[in-house]
Amino acid sequence: MMIILFNCFFCASFREDGQHPTVSLGGVWGAAKELHEDKEFHQSDVHVFIIMGASGDLAKKKIYPTLWWLFRDGLLPEQTYFVGFARSALTVDAIRTSCMPYLKVTETESDRLSAFFSRNSYISGNYTAGGSFSELNAHIMSLPGASDANRLFYLALPPTIYHSVTENIKHFCMSAKGWNRVIVEKPFGHDLQSSEELSTHLSSLFTEDQIYRIDHYLGKEMVQNLMVLRFGNRIFGPIWNRDNVACVVLTFKEPFGTQGRGGYFDDFGIIRDVMQNHMLQMLCLVAMEKPASTNSDDVRDEKVKVLKCIVPASMSDVVLGQYVGDPEGEGDAKLGYLDDPTVPKGSTQATFATVVLYVHNERWDGVPFILRCGKALNERKAEVRLQFTDVPGDIFRNQCYRNELVVRVQPNEAIYAKMMSKKPGVYFTPEETELDLTYKSRYKDVKLPDAYERLILDVFCGSQMHFVASDELREAWRIFTPLLHQIEKEKPKPIPYKYGSRGPAEADELEKRVGFRYEGTYKWVNPHRL
């Protein structure tokens, strides 16, 4: 499945006018041909995609736009129908109107868009009422060919109603002849116990191959590229270990605060929101051993093995912060987290965290994995940074700095290596520079699909490689639950940091203490001026 996605999306054309890029006609045919040859992807079958929570923001901003792009580019089975379900009294026209700002439709695509929405329908009902789901099933059965159709249920819902919705899907809405797949959005629980309760509940209703726990970060281009970078290049294998890597830094930075969502965020915090899922998944791809194949089970088994080697996070290796307003800032930058009217007064919830983890196995023993994430920081950035050890036998009198390999996930996907080179001219002194692969420069005519496009297409094709397995989830919560419970019990006051800054200075001190060396001599500048 990985090869299929690579080929089908890398034949598209990149638009420079700000519109969502479209796949070329030849690309559509090539992609469709490869998809239709996949054993799980039956072009002639009828498929029904049901959006539970069709009136919500996630459906409006992500799910409907993604389905439209896949439909527009000819990447879905020919007979695919879309059914929205929510409590609100809505029409398909109302859904279309609310989604339009996010669909990125060009003038030439209006007929295709009308064809897409002609395949849409909407049913209003109660999430806890079996009668509503019986009506939903009757509506699905009224669609052409639906008696044999495959059904995909996307739960774009708050986790508080997962139990009742999944029970009603199981009892009233399952396809008797086709396959059934359920897509579940994070958060997958609040801690280890609640996650186990959710997993037990889901497994009592569905088999593991029917459950798709979606972490959209696993659909991002550079996150998926980590496996190819590691296991498709001979040069990295011998140095990807404790003998050569001094530390690994995984960074997730957002330049905005909670901005009215503080009440929701305050229930979870930055560790649950980003670190326990997105960042830990990236750590797995960096640290795991080579799987036997790219088969979903083989890949997920290796991720579980590396998670089992990580001991729970220790408070002594943690820095927590909370942003405050910048008096000299503009707009929202003047406001701190506690200025958000939806945030409880005096909240000690962290909006920034640095946590150091260690993988206790032969490859990584002693190497710190530094996870750093936060809101209201100085830039938008997500990256994986491997800093290598010093060159032994230095002959350049401490003028050489550590090599680094950086995989930039967002923005402007890139891979670059910081290295030493002779300074040009008559000098014989080392100078820090980079080897650079910036995607939008190297792949000018390539469309990089949205993460949800890849993942929803994976569900149609039956590939679970980029979805979270129940045993992965269990290990992830095992690592962070003791720390989260300690924070909730002791309520340590987070260190204040200014909106638009790099975060608390104490985080830099922690990174330095465990072995990361920030030289302060060099900043990578994108030479392509994207």
From Swiss-Prot:
The gene is g6pd. GO terms for molecular function: glucose-6-phosphate dehydrogenase activity; NADP binding. NADP(+) 2 binds at residues 372, 381, 385, 408, 416-418, 436-438, 502, 518, 524. Belongs to the glucose-6-phosphate dehydrogenase family. NADP(+) 1 binds at residues 53-60, 87, 162, 186. PROSITE patterns: G6P_DEHYDROGENASE (PS00069). SUPFAM superfamilies: Glyceraldehyde-3-phosphate dehydrogenase-like, C-terminal domain, NAD(P)-binding Rossmann-fold domains. It is found in: Cytoplasm, Cytosol. It catalyses: D-glucose 6-phosphate + NADP(+) = 6-phospho-D-glucono-1,5-lactone + NADPH + H(+). Transmembrane segments: none annotated. Its EC number is 1.1.1.49. Keywords: Carbohydrate metabolism, Cytoplasm, Glucose metabolism, NADP, Oxidoreductase. PANTHER family: GLUCOSE-6-PHOSPHATE 1-DEHYDROGENASE (PTHR23429:SF0), GLUCOSE-6-PHOSPHATE 1-DEHYDROGENASE G6PD (PTHR23429). D-glucose 6-phosphate binds at residues 186, 216-220, 254, 273, 375, 380, 410. It comes from the Eukaryota. Cytosolic glucose-6-phosphate dehydrogenase that catalyzes the first and rate-limiting step of the oxidative branch within the pentose phosphate pathway/shunt, an alternative route to glycolysis for the dissimilation of carbohydrates and a major source of reducing power and metabolic intermediates for fatty acid and nucleic acid biosynthetic processes. This is Glucose-6-phosphate 1-dehydrogenase. One of its GO terms (cellular component) is cytosol. Pathway: Carbohydrate degradation; pentose phosphate pathway; D-ribulose 5-phosphate from D-glucose 6-phosphate (oxidative stage): step 1/3. The keyword Translocase does not apply. Pfam families: G6PD_C (PF02781), G6PD_N (PF00479). The active site is at residue 278. One of its GO terms (biological process) is glucose metabolic process.
